[in-house]
Each structure stands twice: as structure tokens, then as C-alpha cells.
């Protein structure tokens, strides 16, 4: 299976080349030239598999230049009991809906599913391509991706990783997870501005041909651990198939019937992975795209106009504080009939004017698949409180946004299709916001709050979050976006 580019249909490269590159030189994103088909019989066979086996099966359909034995070894290591516990992606019934818990990995966020596996895929891809260069991983993060990438790539031979996060734009626990990171090959800095500034800076570096050529001359290749990299996205497709199997096994859905999937959405990668699962054969009726107050996606799905020219809000769900949703480009490409010229036009308009309006036909195609809505901090807090009091389920602010938007969708449409809601982070990463939502005391340091939340909820504190209290901060700097390239050159290139 080869991969093409959202901005150039003449591109045709292998999976390993796409993973190594991360992003096309023209700024476009890679997608399979065609999607593999997964029949109901195939899904039925997955019902008795372990999570690593399910993941290896689905990922193997996309990464055809990897052997089945290779992928089984990688998923067994990446999703081991020591990293994810007994059940990496459990589905929990909260009374009417199913919650897909994606926060049981080493950094307590859904990004672990991709970023524990990506180092294996990336280093193997380099070997398959006969490349011995050092691979420099660049990451822009709104909170969770940075730590998950650092955890995955720390001290991996032949790699270095540099993470940029928005100053003041993460939770305190998210910040500490990054600034205390151990490893000889890791580098972290805050960037003045918001996530979009950091992400735009990283994209600009990738498409700076003079700079990337200079690095290649020094034996260094840039790659990405953001979801613009196909190697980040494909592991996420697997957990939606796994969720369906677990729902069927638990009787939450009759096998073969459709489900709805609700996802808290910022950069559009997680919900796009769910849509790709449907394209492959997963029985899905509707996708519910849930935004916070930065509701650019809600407005787009409703109107057909994407406009980032709006106020940027810092919310209690910081991983969704995004106004430029990079993975939306992949959806535009797919639903426009793989019209690369049309996508180039939209992306050029976004770069020039900060907005674009899709064709009526494309807008209808998007609206047919995706419902949408948003919940501000007050609604998210009320949902946290009510969900805990009525269902005894403790949700983090991102998950609460998805629950609130899904409940609104169900009420307004009467659609009672069995649903799964993606829970993307542990509530302990956002203890202050969760405690405030519950009407509890929020005085004291972050670790006092974590302890208090554990006492109230009866839940165990993730061990790696608890361990942060004894770790010293290594990375305390903050730079201007214009200084990102210089920071990389001074720090990673030695």
C-alpha cells in the first residue's frame, strides 16, 4: 500500500517513507492511496484477541512494508502490562453510554497509544529505507502530545526530540510532566503565544527546504510526532475497532449494528482516526465532534466556512485550545473525492486570509457524517459534577466536553444508537478544574489537589503523576516563535 499527499496526487511513497517524512515538502499530509477493507467476519475474529493483537492486525493492513511478526512484536512491547496495565483501552458502561478510556498509558493521555508505538515504527522505517541519519523529532503540543512523545522517544538510539508548548497554555501537571522529563536526547521549551503559534512554527521548519537540506548534509533528518505524521494517526484507528469489539462482547451493541462515536476534538486527529475506521468497515452511523469555547470546528461543520480569525480562549480543556485543526485537511481531501487542487486552494486561502469556505457539495458531505457542538468551561464543569454525582464516573474536562455535546446531540435528534465517548485524559491531570467543578476545596499545590481528588473519588492516582512531586524541573525556558529554528539548531544539533 502506497501513500499519496493531500496537495499532490502524483505523490506515491511507501508507508515507511511517509512515517519518516512526517509531512510532505509542500506542506500536505499523507494518506493511503486506498483504504483496506475490514469485513464483519474480520471484526468478529478480533473479538477474542488481546489489545496488542488487535492493534497489530489493524495497523498491519495499512503498513504493508512491515511484516506481521514485526508489528506483533512492536505492539506487544508498546502496549505491555508494565506500560498500560491489564487492559490498555477498557470500555466502561456509565449507564446508557460507553466510555472508551484512553488514559491508562504512561502519561495518562490518549496520545500514549500512538507515541509508545511510534519510536518502533520510526526507527524500523529508517532501517527499511537504509537511512543511518539521526532523526530529530519536532513536536508542537497543546499539552498531552509533548509528554507522550518525550516518554516514547527518551534515550531511543539515533533520535533526538524537541517539544514546544504554549507558555501558560497547559495545566500545571501537563507542564511538569514535560519540564521534568529525563533523557539525554530530549529538549523542551515554552513558546510565547498559543498552540497555533507553536504548530505553525514547526510546520514552517519542515517546509524550509534550505534548512532541511542543510540538516541532511549534517546527517540529520527531521520528522514529526504530531498527528500530521501518519505513523501517529494509524495506531488510533485500531482502538476504535477494539472498542466496538468490547462493546459487542459486553452486549452494549448487537454485533453488526452501527454505533455513534463522540470525540473531544482540537486538532481533528482522534475523530479522523474514527472516520478512517468507518471507511475501512467499522459500523458507524454518526460522529459527534465536540469542541470547547474555541469552537472553530463547530462553526465550520455548521456553516461550511472555516475561520480562524477569532478570539483565542484559554480553557479548562487546554488540549483542545486550538484554532488551526491540521488534520481537517485530510478530511477535506477524502470527502472532496481526493481533489488535491481543491485542497490546495483551501489551504492557500487559510494561509493568506485565515479562512476558507468549502463547496456546497463538500459541506453537505461533511455534515452527513459529522454532528457537532461545543461546551464552554461552565457547561463542562456542570457535566463533571453531574456525571460524578449521578453516574459515579469522574471525567476530566475534555471528556466532559464530549459528554455534554453528545447529550445535547441525543436530546435534539432522538438518536438512540449505541454510543461510545472517547475519554482522552485522566482527571488527575486536571485536578484543580475537576475539584472546582465538584465544589471542593482547591487550595494548596497541585499534589495536594491530586491527593484530595483521590480521597473524594476513591480512584488510584496514576503512579507516574504521583512521582512528579519528587522530580526537579530541567527545562524552564521560554522563547519567541521566531526563535524556534535557532533553538533546535543550538539544542538538538550537536
Question: How would you name each of these model-derived features?
Answer:
Residues 1-494:
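PLP-dependent amino-acid enzyme catalytic core
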Amino acid at each position: 500500500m502506497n501513500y499519496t499527499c493531500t496537495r499532490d496526487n502524483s505523490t506515491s511513497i511507501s508507508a515507511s517513507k511517509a512515517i519518516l517524512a512526517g509531512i510532505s515538502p509542500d506542506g500536505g499530509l499523507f494518506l493511503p492511496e486506498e483504504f483496506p477493507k475490514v469485513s464483519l467476519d474480520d471484526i468478529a475474529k478480533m473479538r477474542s484477541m488481546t489489545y496488542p493483537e488487535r492493534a497489530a492486525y489493524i495497523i498491519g493492513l495499512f503498513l504493508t512494508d512491515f511484516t506481521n511478526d514485526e508489528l506483533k512484536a512492536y505492539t506487544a512491547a508498546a502496549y505491555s502490562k508494565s506500560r498500560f496495565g491489564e487492559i490498555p483501552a477498557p470500555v466502561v458502561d456509565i449507564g446508557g453510554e460507553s466510555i472508551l478510556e484512553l488514559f491508562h498509558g504512561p502519561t495518562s493521555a490518549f496520545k500514549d497509544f500512538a507515541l509508545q508505538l511510534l519510536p518502533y515504527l520510526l526507527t524500523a522505517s529508517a532501517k527499511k529505507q537504509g537511512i543511518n541519519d539521526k532523526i530529530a523529532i519536532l513536536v508542537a503540543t497543546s499539552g498531552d502530545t509533548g509528554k507522550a512523545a518525550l516518554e516514547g522517544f527518551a534515550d531511543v538510539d539515533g533520535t533526538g526530540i524537541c517539544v514546544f508548548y504554549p507558555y501558560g497554555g497547559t495545566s500545571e501537571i501537563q507542564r511538569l510532566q514535560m519540564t521534568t522529563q529525563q533523557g539525554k536526547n530530549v529538549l523542551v521549551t515554552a513558546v510565547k503565544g498559543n498552540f497555533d503559534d507553536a504548530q505553525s512554527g514547526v510546520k514552517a521548519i519542515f517546509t524550509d527546504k534550505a534548512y532541511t537540506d542543510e540538516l541532511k548534509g549534517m546527517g540529520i533528518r527531521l520528522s514529526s510526532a504530531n498527528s500530521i505524521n501518519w505513523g501517529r494517526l494509524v495506531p488510533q484507528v485500531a482502538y476504535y475497532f477494539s472498542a466496538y469489539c468490547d462493546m459487542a462482547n459486553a452486549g452494549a451493541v448487537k454485533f453488526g449494528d452501527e454505533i455513534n462515536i463522540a470525540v473531544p476534538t482540537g486538532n481533528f486527529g482522534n475523530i479522523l482516526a474514527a472516520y478512517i475506521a468507518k471507511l475501512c468497515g467499522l459500523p458507524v452511523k454518526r460522529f459527534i465532534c465536540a469542541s470547547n469555547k474555541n469552537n472553530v470546528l463547530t462553526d465550520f461543520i455548521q456553516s461550511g466556512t472555516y475561520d480562524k480569525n477569532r478570539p483565542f480562549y484559554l480553557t479548562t480543556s487546554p488540549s483542545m485550545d486550538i484554532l488551526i485543526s491540521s488534520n481537517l485537511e485530510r478530511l477535506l481531501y477524502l470527502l472532496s473525492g481526493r481533489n488535491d487542487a481543491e485542497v490546495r486552494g483551501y489551504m492557500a486561502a487559510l494561509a493568506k486570509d485565515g479562512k476558507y469556505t468549502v463547496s456546497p457539495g463538500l459541506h453537505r458531505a461533511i455534515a452527513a457524517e459529522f454532528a457537532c457542538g461545543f461546551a464552554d468551561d461552565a457547561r463542562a464543569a456542570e457535566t463533571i459534577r453531574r456525571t460524578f454525582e449521578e453516574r459515579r464516573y469522574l471525567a476530566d474536562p475534555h471528556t466532559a466536553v464530549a459528554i455534554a455535546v453528545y447529550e445535547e446531540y441525543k436530546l435534539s435528534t432522538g438518536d438512540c444508537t449505541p454510543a461510545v465517548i472517547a475519554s482522552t485524559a485522566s482527571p488527575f491531570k486536571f485536578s484543580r478544574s475537576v475539584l472546582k467543578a465538584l465544589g471542593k476545596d482547591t487550595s494548596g499545590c497541585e499534589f495536594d489537589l491530586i491527593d484530595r481528588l483521590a480521597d473524594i473519588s476513591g480512584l488510584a492516582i496514576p503512579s507516574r503523576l504521583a512521582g512528579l512531586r519528587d522530580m526537579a524541573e530541567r527545562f524552564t525556558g521560554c522563547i519567541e516563535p521566531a526563535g524556534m529554528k535557532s533553538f533546535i539548531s543550538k539544542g538538538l544539533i550537536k
